[in-house]
């Protein structure tokens, strides 16, 4: 079934109308070549969870991170289909504090709550793990600020 669909796509991609409206066909590779070209896209390197966490902690721990890089990192992290580990969030909150960007700290915590979705036990766990950092940096949660009622 997949081979037939790939062959149809390959033929459609190599057929064009000439100047008189006649259909012309370029020589198409066989079905094995078409399937092989699709499979080549999945041969990228795979990052382990530990490498992923280390990459993001390192990113947010850069001493010269600026506000644009911070927001870009937060936006990229939020697009992933996961709730970041508390150590990544800790590093991001510390970067926000270095830049005196309180709004981003609230945004990060709101994003974590949103990413947890229907799993109501995830957000309290993350806040529990981050509580020492939140207290140290003087950061209030959205609930403490009353933003959850707005």
Curated annotation (Swiss-Prot):
- What keywords appear on the UniProt entry? Acetylation, Heme, Iron, Membrane, Metal-binding, Mitochondrion, Mitochondrion inner membrane, Phosphoprotein, Transit peptide, Ubl conjugation
List the GO molecular function terms: metal ion binding
Post-translationally, this protein is described as follows, namely:
In response to mitochondrial stress, the precursor protein is ubiquitinated by the SIFI complex in the cytoplasm before mitochondrial import, leading to its degradation. Within the SIFI complex, UBR4 initiates ubiquitin chain that are further elongated or branched by KCMF1.
User: Which residues are annotated as modified residue Phosphothreonine in the UniProt record?
Assistant: 141
Cellular component GO terms, alphabetical:
mitochondrial inner membrane; respiratory chain complex IV
Question: Could you point out where the transit peptide sits in the sequence?
Answer: 1-41
The sequence motif named SIFI-degron is recorded at 2-20
Please give the chief subcellular localization of this protein.
Answer: mitochondrion
What's an example Gene Ontology biological process for this entry? mitochondrial electron transport, cytochrome c to oxygen
Tell where it localizes.
Mitochondrion inner membrane
Q: Topology in the membrane?
A: Peripheral membrane protein
* UniProt entry tagged with the keyword Manganese: no
A Pfam family the protein falls into? COX5A
Gene3D superfamilies per the record? Cytochrome c oxidase, subunit Va/VI
Q: Which domain of life is it from?
A: Eukaryota
Name the pathway it acts in: Energy metabolism; oxidative phosphorylation
Entry-linked InterPro entries: Cyt_c_oxidase_su5A/6, Cyt_c_oxidase_su5A/6_sf
Which parts of the sequence carry N6-acetyllysine? 87, 113
Please give the family membership noted in the entry.
Answer: Belongs to the cytochrome c oxidase subunit 5A family.
Q: What does this protein do?
A: Component of the cytochrome c oxidase, the last enzyme in the mitochondrial electron transport chain which drives oxidative phosphorylation. The respiratory chain contains 3 multisubunit complexes succinate dehydrogenase (complex II, CII), ubiquinol-cytochrome c oxidoreductase (cytochrome b-c1 complex, complex III, CIII) and cytochrome c oxidase (complex IV, CIV), that cooperate to transfer electrons derived from NADH and succinate to molecular oxygen, creating an electrochemical gradient over the inner membrane that drives transmembrane transport and the ATP synthase.
Q: How does this protein assemble?
A: Component of the cytochrome c oxidase (complex IV, CIV), a multisubunit enzyme composed of 14 subunits. The complex is composed of a catalytic core of 3 subunits MT-CO1, MT-CO2 and MT-CO3, encoded in the mitochondrial DNA, and 11 supernumerary subunits COX4I, COX5A, COX5B, COX6A, COX6B, COX6C, COX7A, COX7B, COX7C, COX8 and NDUFA4, which are encoded in the nuclear genome.
Q: What is this protein called?
A: Cytochrome c oxidase subunit 5A, mitochondrial
The species is: Macaca mulatta (Rhesus macaque)
Q: What is the lineage of its organism?
A: Eukaryota, Metazoa, Chordata, Craniata, Vertebrata
Q: Which gene encodes it?
A: COX5A
């Amino acid at each position: 079934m997949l081979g037939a669909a790939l062959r149809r796509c390959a033929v459609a991609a190599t057929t064009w109308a000439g100047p008189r409206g006649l259909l012309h066909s370029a020589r198409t590779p066989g079905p094995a070549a078409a399937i092989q070209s699709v499979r080549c896209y999945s041969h990228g390197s795979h990052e382990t969870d530990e490498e992923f966490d280390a990459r993001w902690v390192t990113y947010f721990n850069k001493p010269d991170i600026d506000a644009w890089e911070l927001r870009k990192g937060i936006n990229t992290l939020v697009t992933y289909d996961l709730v970041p580990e508390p150590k990544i969030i800790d590093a991001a909150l510390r970067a926000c504090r270095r830049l005196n960007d309180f709004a981003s700290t609230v945004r990060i915590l709101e994003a974590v709550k949103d990413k947890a979705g229907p799993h109501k036990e995830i957000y309290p766990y993350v806040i529990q793990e981050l509580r020492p950092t939140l207290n140290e940096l003087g950061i209030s949660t959205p609930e403490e600020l009353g933003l959850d009622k707005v």
